[in-house]
């Protein structure tokens, strides 16, 4: 009898395996695997049933049915090079508050995929995490600071860290919300790690809002539908009922739907509100306005009218990361990738205040003193580099910073060999190593507010100890360069990156830093 049961189970597994491998659009494998992932978080190790029960379909077999990550679309880019200060001593870039690239990396490692180097944007790895920077004071909406110390992966080089923090808002200071939920219900979203997860997130967000906040709900697949007119959160049951009815089928008329969502936001526009379109999709815009350039142009036009954008990406194998990053940047918004319930809670609950922009068109300009610095390299921010002339051009769009959000940037710098002699030379009047200028607007149509921070040329030699955040940032950057196989990674190794990250665990309010250490132990075909 036991042999007979084993035979039946074996044949059943084979039959299911054959059927599932041909169901390319059903994604049952994703559903089964994702349900396990979502129940316990993002980085748990998975194996056979812990209770010793015979699994009808093993984890490895389920993983084999998941769509290949090769279908995901990323823009290729080249790492920023070293620049000689004799050629150009000034570097300018827009802030980037996204964290999608880090969550995509976590998804790939969790599912056993190799990392696509083009998916690794080091600035988004850094800005996924909250840093323990000094809060703004008085009427300022932003604080800035800088540190410099030895570069761990290049002996003789130094690392410059720029730290930026947005003003935190109390519950009473939060502006009223005018949110339009724009939900992709096309067939490709029919998965527990896509539409089901998005529905959970939108429902969780409701619990964070105030009764007088307002929600609209628009869906798109082959057609565009307005499921819910602008409704106050005081009628939460009505909103939750509309969310519960979301089901996936059809193709994707994304461009048409996006326009309707913006028009809905404009209809209920209030200059005192947080007017925002929150779009959830796997990025498969295959019907209607599909050109990324056309979408960007449309989004920019509504951004100028005061409507912000939050882009939420879901799933693997169909993710159009390139489109979502460009659209969110153009829409005065942010781009998040939701790979699990923990990430959904991070975005919709723990960091929900970051949906409110406290600094608009935020730009950084770093001036290196050629008397002391021979070369520098901005690590990351490749698609946010700006012309130096645009720094003081208030009409030039730049990035936004959410309430309580921190932004981090790193430069690798090479000091001149006669550095100390120059510093001691009394005829050299400028003793500044670096000048960090920053500009932002409190409101989209307001004036730019300048901030400035300087580091004196003796700073690299004051070995009084650096904040733990400095070492953590260095570890994150080293890990990102390893995953990208960057030509500038120098002597960086996984063990070096882990050691640096461990030094930054004293500040870890939600456990995200500790999670990074676990991810570093996961196998990727990465150079050591």
Where are these regions (language model features)?
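Exposed acidic/Ser/Thr-rich ligand/metal-binding surfaces
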Residues: 43-52, 56-57, 144-362, 389, ...
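Long, acidic serine/threonine- and proline-rich intrinsically disordered regions
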Residues: 56-58, 84-87, 91, 99-106, ...
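Post-signal peptide N-terminal segment of mature Sec-exported envelope proteins
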Residues: 50-74
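C-terminal motif of bacterial Sec signal peptides marking the signal peptidase cleavage site
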Residues: 38-41
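Short, Lys/Arg-enriched N-terminal segments with co-localized hydrophobic residues
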Residues: 3-22
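Acidic, Ser/Thr- and Gly-enriched intrinsically disordered low-complexity segments
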Residues: 110-137, 357, 367-388, 402
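Bacterial N-terminal signal peptides that target proteins for export
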Residues: 21-30
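Acidic/polar low-complexity segments with low predicted structural confidence
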Residues: 75-158
């Amino acid at each position: 009898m036991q042999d007979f049961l084993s035979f039946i189970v074996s044949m059943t597994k084979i039959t299911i395996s054959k059927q599932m491998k041909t169901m390319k659009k059903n994604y049952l494998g994703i559903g089964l695997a994702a349900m396990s992932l979502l129940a316990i978080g993002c980085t748990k190790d998975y194996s056979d049933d812990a209770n010793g029960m015979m699994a009808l379909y093993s984890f490895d077999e389920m993983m084999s049915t998941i769509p290949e990550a090769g279908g995901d679309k990323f823009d290729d880019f080249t790492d920023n090079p070293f620049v000689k200060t004799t050629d150009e001593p000034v570097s300018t870039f827009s802030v980037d508050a996204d964290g999608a690239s880090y969550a995509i990396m976590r998804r790939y490692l969790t599912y056993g995929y190799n990392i696509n180097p083009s998916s690794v944007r080091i600035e988004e790895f850094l800005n996924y995490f909250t840093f323990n920077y000094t809060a703004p004071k008085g009427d300022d909406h932003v604080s800035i600071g800088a540190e410099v110390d030895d570069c761990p992966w290049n002996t003789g080089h130094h690392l410059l860290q720029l730290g930026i923090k947005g003003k935190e808002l109390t519950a009473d200071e939060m502006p009223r919300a005018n949110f339009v939920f724009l939900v992709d219900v096309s067939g490709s979203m029919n998965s527990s790690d896509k539409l089901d997860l998005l529905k959970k997130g939108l429902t969780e967000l409701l619990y964070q809002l105030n009764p007088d906040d307002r929600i609209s709900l628009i869906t798109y697949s082959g057609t565009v539908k307005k499921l819910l007119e602008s409704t106050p959160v005081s009628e939460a049951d009505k909103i939750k009922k509309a969310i519960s009815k979301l089901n996936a089928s059809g193709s994707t008329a994304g461009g048409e739907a996006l326009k309707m969502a913006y028009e809905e936001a404009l209809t209920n526009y209030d200059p005192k509100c947080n007017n925002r379109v929150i779009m959830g999709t796997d990025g498969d815009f295959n019907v209607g306005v599909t050109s990324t350039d056309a979408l960007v142009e449309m989004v920019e036009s509504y951004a100028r009218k005061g409507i912000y954008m939050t882009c939420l990406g879901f799933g693997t194998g169909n993710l159009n990361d390139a489109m979502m990053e460009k659209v969110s940047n153009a829409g005065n918004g942010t781009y998040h990738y939701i790979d699990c319930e923990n990430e959904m809670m991070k975005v919709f609950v723990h960091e929900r205040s970051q949906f409110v922009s406290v600094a608009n068109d935020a730009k950084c300009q770093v001036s290196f003193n050629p008397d002391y610095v021979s070369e520098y390299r901005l690590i990351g921010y490749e698609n946010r580099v700006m012309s130096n002339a645009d720094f003081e051009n208030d009409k030039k769009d730049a990035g936004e910073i959410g309430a309580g959000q921190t932004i981090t940037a790193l430069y690798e710098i090479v000091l001149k060999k006669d550095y100390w002699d120059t510093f001691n030379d009394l005829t050299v009047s400028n003793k500044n190593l670096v000048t960090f200028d920053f500009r932002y607007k409190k409101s989209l149509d307001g004036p730019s507010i300048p901030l400035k921070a300087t580091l004196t040329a003796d700073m690299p030699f004051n070995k009084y100890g650096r904040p733990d955040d400095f070492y953590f940032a260095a570890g994150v950057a080293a890990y990102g360069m390893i995953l990208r196989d960057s030509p500038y990674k120098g002597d960086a190794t996984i063990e070096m990156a882990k050691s640096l990250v461990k030094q930054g665990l004293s500040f870890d309010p939600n456990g995200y830093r500790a999670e990074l250490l676990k991810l570093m132990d996961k196998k990727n075909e990465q150079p050591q």
